[in-house]
């Protein structure tokens, strides 16, 4: 696995150390994920991962599974097991800005998620569509192409892209099931959007 820079490696090492001291029974109950034979089983974007405890290791029956080679994604999963909680029932979707602390983080979020999605996928709508379909996402009738993903447990995300033209640049929108606002901190919602885009991009 390649580590791109210290900004990825240092946070991962911090949470890996905290993970070793985790109470696995408490984490399993709080997050709603199974723990057996020294391993948590977590499903992210339709792929099952086994996370070994207390000496961290991640594995999957899918050799090309995205998180196996993406350190920020692994850090996100560690944070979920350390601080997250099982999804509450969801009644709908919200934009990032509509959720708590969304206004404060909207600048980084726009750059890391919306602008990146717009220029990564808005210029390649058909490839975006094919990648989402290959990932098992559900097509929705919004945007030039739009899909709904089961992100993690009962947390869902929708992503819509709009192709640019001579007058307007490409654009995008990402919606979160409203249980994200109680299940994740604002910075983790930014990372969730980043992970979704990176995972789709890996399938282009």
Where are the language model's segments positioned?
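Charge-rich alpha-helical segments
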Residues: 1-18, 28, 37, 55-57, ...
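Short, charged/polar micro-motifs that form catalytic or ligand-binding hotspots
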Residues: 63, 67, 118, 145, ...
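Intrinsically disordered, low-complexity regulatory segments enriched in Ser/Thr/Pro
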Residues: 47-75, 162-187
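Conserved binding-pocket/active-site segment within a compact domain
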Residues: 122-182
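Ampiphathic alpha-helical segments that act as solvent-exposed interaction surfaces
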Residues: 66-90, 177-204
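Amphipathic, interaction-prone secondary-structure segments
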Residues: 27-53, 138-163
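Short Lys/Arg-enriched alpha/beta "domain-start" segment
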Residues: 1-38, 73, 80-135
């Amino acid at each position: 696995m390649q580590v791109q820079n210290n900004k990825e490696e240092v946070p991962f090492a911090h949470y890996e150390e905290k993970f070793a001291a985790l109470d696995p029974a408490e984490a399993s109950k709080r997050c709603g994920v199974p723990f057996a034979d020294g391993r948590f089983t977590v499903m992210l974007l339709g792929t099952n991962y086994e996370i070994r405890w207390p000496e961290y290791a991640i594995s999957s029956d899918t050799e090309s599974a995205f998180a196996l080679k993406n350190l920020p994604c692994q850090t996100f999963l560690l944070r979920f097991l350390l601080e997250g909680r099982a999804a509450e029932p969801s009644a709908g979707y919200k934009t990032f800005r509509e959720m708590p602390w969304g206004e404060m983080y909207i600048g980084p979020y726009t750059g890391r998620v919306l602008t990146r999605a717009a220029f990564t996928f808005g210029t390649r709508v058909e490839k975006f569509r094919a990648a989402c379909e290959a990932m098992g996402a559900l097509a929705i009738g919004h945007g030039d192409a739009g899909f709904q993903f089961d992100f993690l447990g009962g947390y869902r995300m929708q992503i819509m892209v709009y192709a640019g033209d001579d007058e307007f640049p490409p654009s995008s929108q990402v919606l979160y099931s409203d249980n994200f606002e109680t299940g994740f901190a604002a910075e983790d919602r930014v990372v969730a959007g980043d992970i979704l885009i990176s995972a789709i991009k890996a399938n282009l």
